């Protein structure tokens, strides 16, 4: 019974630990999830959840306990002990520490066996006593915790003397586990068993009786307790009444209650010169202003006064004018009675050496500084000053471990030394040990603090450590508050300002951060550290030009080694930024060359290598960049955590989320420097934001928000995270919420053009066209000369339907890019490294530069082969063997296939649909039909001239057509015309079709009107209107509809009309009706369906009706920007009211089965290159065709009777059908295109061939890859 109850309760007990607060905040949700996964025996998911929680709050007790418990369960006691130590280090020690300590103890095999024995003992009191003894042997005097405590106290309560202790223990557990119904039930039972507390037990059981988990047990025990109570006293009657309210039919309990109610009714020495006495007293008091004139006056009276010389030496020492002090003291020691000043002289020499060492350190002469400190140490080994100075130098050189050891060594010999103490506090603070620094500060007594140098602001230091600890926990608000407190205590400290400014940055408060740093610069415009921190802020904001300018204001002589290193960092970032911008303009070879020339700037420093590697990723050489960073890690046998984090950053840039995540998980929980902690936090933040964006793009908004929410909790006002959240809301259709999120970002950064464009994008998705327009215009006003801004604004204009304005913006962007490109080429021509050569890549010229430009080399004879050279950026990593597609070509080798800038690509996209052109084609179509009847040879020479008009296009189409069916054979005359015997001659016709067309590409709208070829036997008005658009809710879904009147081109009869030998004319059929279709395509698979209904009308031809239905599905077996392969299944059905597939008078001469079914397997391959695009399509399948019998002369009963009522036989066939089509287009130049197409259709005994060619001339230049798939130009009359 007991064991069964415990098993039921495990889940509830685990959950109760975490349910203290509402689960609306991320931490509470994670606590609940962690205990849930542990209750489900899923340690992997639980560990992942606890690690997420620790990233939010590094000291969160539930997370530390959860991971510790997993280590216990997986038999890793040493790892579990580490988490126990972390819990025990918290103040106050949380209950989870006691629980984990017990779990570790119970997991010891001997204790586990004892626990098993205790649980196996039965109900008799003697066995319970034994069980209690076993439990206590496990606890070893510690207070029982958790589930084991619950079972222990329950067992203890049933022993002779254990009731009171059991009740007290269970009462404690109910406070610790308020949502654990098992604990409440055990406590209620033991209270009910004890006569003194039975009424309390009954009340508790009454409450538990309605509990879903323990209600049945509680209800049963409730009744027993009332029976044990017996007839109630007057104040106990309500206990029975409450039970009877729930169980009104329980006569035994009612009788007991009634019984209780019924029972309740009854000497003379030498004296120093008074002036000298006064001077020395002032000197002792530190009153140098009083002492100096007195000593000077004495020396004026008596220049060899030993005490005056010695006193002046001490005064100069206190003024830190050590050379002068040494001079005075040397004179004093050489006079009679001057031996007393020897120790003062030694002291001055000691401090003079230390002063000189500090000057050397400031000048960057570290070796000389250390030599001077060593001399001072030898001069006075007992003085701590030299050791303190050395530790300070080590701290300045970031040798924090050595500095810490040095300070601690001094304090061991000179406890409480104020300089060593303050130095150690600073080192602990700088080396990422704010907790240790805080403990040390709090241990310093007021008396010790009073001895600190005036420059040591201990209260500011303490607040700074509190801020750093809050920062480590991810509590930005607490960190900001602490740093503000530190700034109040030390307002002139630039580093405290910088710490607070960093918090503002992480909270998205860029303006506040800049104002804070600039505030100090206004009052101290030339203070080196103020300028330095301002430079660092600009660096964090990637404002490299401003960083360079600010750092340049610090005189070279006053720059520290760190400042000089920062100057190199700035130079590298400026170079890489130029390279990235160059690549964005489509000049990838030039960008790679710039990066190659930047490599010496890294000086193999991992942080700089990471910057350069990230830049290679940005310009498209991702693998090369990753290899650079991988070498940094692999070349170090024991790579530091910082180096791993740098590599993870480059992996994130390259969208290698899995590899980056592995490093971040590996680093998690490891000790980090302050810089490492910040880098880790930034990477985790960026990782979550990028992953959230990726999930949003997959339309998994729930997972995207879950991924982003911890990042938002960490930095609730950061533009990156809030922008990602806004995009989620926009994707969900909640544009209002998205714009609400963007509002404070814009308020904080009103002059950020990219933010304005982000707002415009969201406004456009929310159909707020006015805001989209105004935000785009604001961005353009802020950065009118930035090609990237112009290109992005053009995309917004396109979405607003303003394609002409969009094209103008893109042309402006291209003009700016071309101007920049010219400057880059001039710069390259004069720069070292790979030479610029303007003729590389021109028609008939080399595609690489040669080695003839190498300075100092003797050129080979002109008849000798000349080698091509590669950019030094790739010299060691790649080859120029263009025959191997898997080896990336060098930067110069790729110039024959230049990357296009986004502006060029965007303009090409607009122009491709809208630019004017003229095109002349020639097409031929023929079949294997019967001569004179179903045979047709169709030759057309379509011409089209298209012009843009605003955001629309209009076109004029002129299509000469010649049709020929051959001559009707004599034996076929009965099946032609009215069946006369007169020879019909050759069946042919010629004419010219005319039409005008209109198109609005943005609206998916097309319309045309014209006339079928003039000159044909019959011509008529033809045209149509169609629309094809995506659904607004999901652009993967599309719909289309059209209404049209089109000629039926199956034969000469249906297209042009026929005339027999007797002059009878008929034919010229048109299909009049509409078609609708729906489709879905997510770039992985597609489905579609369509339906159409048409009335077929002709001259002297029986009217007919056609109904068609079809659908299909296809899969992308390959889908890349340059090639696609699809395979599908398609089905269609078609029916005509009448069979008109004949050529006698009254028939239309077109394929018109009464039942047509087709099931096919289509496949399509398409590929695109820079100048060539082609596609091949084929389909094979089964077809069933059934045609009813028909009169020879439908609609003319007299003629039908005259001819003895002849009829065509019905037919029904099932067989294999197939088709093949190939199309291609080649760009002859930026304006001339040559294209063509061939096709074959085969259905049982019918076969048709078709081919066409065309030459197109564009009125504007187009570049970039050819469209995929190719869309060949066809005659308006093509099927």
Swiss-Prot record:
TPR repeats lie at residues 27-60, 62-94, 218-250, 306-339, 384-417, 460-493, 495-527, 606-639, 719-752, 787-820. The keyword Signal applies. Residues 1-21 form the signal peptide. Pathway: Glycan metabolism; bacterial cellulose biosynthesis. GO terms for biological process: cellulose biosynthetic process; UDP-alpha-D-glucose metabolic process. It comes from the Bacteria. Keywords: Cellulose biosynthesis, Repeat, Signal, TPR repeat. One of its GO terms (cellular component) is outer membrane. The keyword Signal applies. InterPro entries: BCSC_C (IPR008410), Cell_synth_C (IPR003921), TPR-like_helical_dom_sf (IPR011990), TPR_rpt (IPR019734). PROSITE patterns: TPR (PS50005), TPR_REGION (PS50293). It holds the Pfam family TPR_8. PANTHER family: CELL DIVISION CYCLE 16,23,27 (PTHR12558), CELL DIVISION CYCLE PROTEIN 27 HOMOLOG (PTHR12558:SF13). Required for maximal bacterial cellulose synthesis. This is Cellulose synthase operon protein C.
């Amino acid at each position: 019974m007991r064991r069964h109850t415990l098993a039921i309760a495990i889940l509830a007990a685990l959950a109760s630990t975490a349910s203290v607060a509402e689960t609306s905040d991320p931490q509470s949700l994670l606590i609940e999830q962690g205990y849930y996964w542990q209750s489900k025996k899923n340690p992997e998911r639980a560990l992942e959840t606890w690690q997420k929680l620790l990233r939010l709050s590094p000291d969160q007790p539930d997370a530390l306990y959860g991971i510790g418990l997993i280590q216990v369960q997986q038999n890793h006691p040493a790892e579990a002990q580490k988490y126990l130590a972390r819990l025990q280090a918290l103040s106050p020690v949380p209950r989870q520490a006691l629980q984990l300590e017990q779990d570790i103890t119970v997991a010891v095999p001997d204790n586990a066996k004892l626990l098993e024995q205790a649980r196996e003992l039965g109900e008799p009191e003697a066995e319970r006593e034994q069980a209690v003894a076993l439990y206590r042997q496990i606890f070893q005097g510690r207070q029982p915790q958790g589930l084991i405590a619950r079972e222990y106290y329950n067992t203890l309560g049933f022993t002779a003397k254990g009731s009171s202790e059991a009740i007290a223990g269970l009462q404690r557990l109910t406070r610790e586990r308020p949502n654990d119904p098992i604990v409440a039930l055990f406590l209620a039972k033991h209270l009910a068993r004890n006569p003194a507390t039975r009424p309390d037990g009954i009340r508790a059981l009454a409450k538990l009786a309605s509990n879903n988990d323990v209600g049945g047990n509680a209800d049963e025990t409730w009744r027993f307790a009332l029976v044990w109570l017996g007839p109630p006293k007057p104040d106990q009657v309500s206990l029975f009444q409450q039970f009877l309210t729930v169980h009104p039919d329980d006569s035994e309990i009612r009788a007991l209650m009634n019984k209780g109610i019924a029972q309740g009714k009854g000497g003379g020495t030498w004296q120093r010169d008074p002036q000298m006495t006064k001077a020395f007293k002032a000197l002792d008091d530190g009153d140098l202003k009083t002492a100096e004139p007195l000593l000077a006056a004495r020396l004026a009276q008596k220049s060899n006064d030993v005490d005056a010389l010695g006193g002046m030496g001490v005064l100069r020492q206190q003024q830190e004018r050590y050379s002068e002090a040494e001079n005075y003291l040397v004179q004093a020691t050489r006079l009679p009675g001057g031996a007393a000043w020897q120790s003062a002289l030694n002291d001055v020499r000691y401090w003079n050496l230390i002063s000189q060492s500090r000057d050397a350190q400031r000048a960057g002469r570290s070796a000389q500084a250390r030599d001077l400190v060593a001399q001072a140490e030898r001069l006075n080994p007992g003085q701590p000053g030299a050791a303190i100075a050395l530790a300070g130098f080590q701290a300045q050189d970031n040798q924090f471990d050595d500095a810490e050891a040095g300070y601690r060594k001094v304090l061991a010999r000179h406890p409480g030394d104020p300089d060593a103490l303050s130095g150690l506090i600073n080192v602990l603070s700088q080396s990422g040990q704010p907790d240790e620094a805080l403990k040390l500060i709090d241990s310093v007594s007021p008396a010790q603090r009073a001895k600190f140098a005036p420059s040591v602001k201990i209260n500011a230091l303490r607040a700074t450590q509190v801020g750093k600890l809050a920062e480590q926990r991810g509590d930005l608000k607490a960190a900001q508050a602490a740093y503000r407190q530190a700034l109040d205590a030390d307002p002139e400290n630039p580093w405290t300002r910088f710490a607070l400014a960093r918090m503002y940055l992480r909270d998205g408060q860029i303006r506040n951060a800049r104002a804070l740093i600039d505030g100090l610069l206004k009052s101290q415009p030339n203070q080196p550290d103020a300028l330095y921190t301002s430079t660092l802020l600009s660096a964090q904001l990637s404002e490299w030009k401003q960083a360079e300018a600010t750092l340049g204001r610090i005189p070279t002589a006053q720059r520290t080694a760190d400042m000089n290193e920062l100057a190199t960092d700035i130079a590298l970032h400026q170079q890489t930024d130029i390279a990235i911008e160059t690549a964005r303009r489509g000049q990838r070879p030039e960008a790679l060359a710039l990066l190659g020339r930047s490599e010496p700037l890294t000086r193999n420093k991992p942080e700089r290598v990471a910057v350069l590697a990230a830049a290679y990723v940005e310009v498209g050489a991702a693998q090369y960049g990753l290899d650079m960073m991988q070498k940094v890690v692999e070349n170090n046998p024991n790579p530091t955590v910082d180096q791993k984090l740098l590599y993870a950053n480059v992996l994130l840039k390259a969208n290698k989320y899995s590899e980056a995540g592995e490093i971040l998980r590996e680093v998690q929980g490891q000790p980090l420097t302050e810089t490492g902690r910040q880098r880790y936090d930034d990477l985790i933040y960026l990782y979550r934001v990028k992953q959230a964006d990726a999930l949003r793009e997959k339309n998994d908004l729930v997972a995207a928000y879950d991924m982003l929410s911890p990042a938002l909790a960490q930095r609730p006002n950061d533009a990156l995270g809030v922008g990602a959240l806004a995009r989620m809301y926009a994707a969900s259709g909640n544009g209002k919420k998205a714009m609400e999120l963007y509002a404070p970002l814009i308020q904080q950064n009103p002059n950020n053009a990219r933010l304005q464009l982000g707002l415009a994008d969201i406004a456009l998705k929310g159909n707020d066209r006015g805001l989209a327009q105004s935000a785009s215009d604001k961005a353009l006003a802020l950065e009118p000369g930035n090609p990237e801004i112009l290109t992005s604004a053009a995309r917004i204009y396109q979405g607003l339907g303003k394609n002409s304005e969009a094209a103008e913006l893109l042309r402006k962007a291209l003009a700016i890019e071309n101007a920049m490109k010219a400057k880059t080429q001039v710069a390259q021509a004069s720069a070292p490294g790979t030479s610029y050569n303007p003729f590389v890549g021109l028609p008939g010229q080399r595609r690489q530069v040669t080695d003839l430009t190498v300075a100092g080399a003797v050129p080979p004879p002109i008849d000798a082969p000349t080698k091509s050279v590669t950019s030094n950026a790739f010299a060691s990593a790649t080859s120029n063997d263009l025959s191997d597609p898997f080896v990336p070509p060098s930067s110069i080798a790729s110039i024959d296939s230049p990357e296009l800038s986004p502006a060029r690509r965007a303009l090409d996209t607009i122009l491709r649909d809208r630019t004017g052109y003229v095109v002349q084609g020639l097409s031929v179509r023929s079949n294997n039909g019967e001569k004179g009847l179903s045979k047709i040879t169709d030759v057309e020479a379509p011409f089209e001239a298209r012009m843009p008009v605003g955001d629309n296009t209009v076109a004029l189409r002129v299509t000469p057509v010649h049709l020929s069916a051959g001559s009707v054979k004599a034996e076929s005359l009965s099946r032609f015309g009215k069946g006369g015997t007169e020879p019909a001659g050759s069946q042919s016709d010629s004419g010219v079709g005319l039409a005008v067309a209109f198109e609005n590409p943005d609206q998916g709208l097309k319309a045309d009107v014209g006339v079928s070829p003039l000159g044909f036997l019959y011509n008529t008005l033809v045209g149509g209107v169609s629309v094809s658009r995506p659904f607004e809710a999901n652009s993967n879904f599309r719909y289309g509809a059209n209404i049209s009147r089109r000629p039926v081109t199956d034969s000469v009869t249906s297209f042009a009309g026929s005339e027999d030998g007797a002059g009878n004319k008929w034919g010229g059929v048109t299909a009049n009706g509409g078609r609708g279709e729906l489709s879905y395509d997510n770039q992985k698979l597609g489905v579609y369906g369509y339906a159409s209904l048409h009335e077929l009308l002709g001259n002297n031809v029986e009217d007919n009706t056609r109904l068609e239905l079809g659908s299909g599905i296809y899969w992308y077996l390959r889908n890349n920007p340059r090639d696609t392969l699809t395979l599908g299944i398609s089905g269609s059905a078609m029916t005509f009211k009448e069979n008109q597939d004949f050529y006698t008078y009254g028939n239309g001469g077109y394929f018109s089965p009464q039942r047509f079914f087709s099931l096919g397997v289509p496949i399509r391959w398409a590929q695109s290159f820079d100048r060539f695009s082609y596609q091949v399509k084929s389909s094979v399948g089964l077809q069933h065709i059934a045609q009813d019998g028909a009169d020879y002369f439908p609609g003319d009963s007299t003629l039908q009777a005259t001819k003895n009522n002849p009829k065509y036989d019905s037919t029904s066939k099932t067989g294999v059908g197939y088709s093949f089509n190939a199309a291609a287009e080649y760009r002859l130049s930026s304006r001339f295109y040559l294209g063509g197409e061939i096709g074959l259709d085969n259905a049982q005994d019918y076969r048709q061939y078709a081919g066409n060619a065309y030459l197109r001339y564009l009125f504007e230049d187009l570049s970039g890859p050819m469209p995929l798939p190719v869309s060949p130009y066809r005659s308006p009359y093509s099927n």
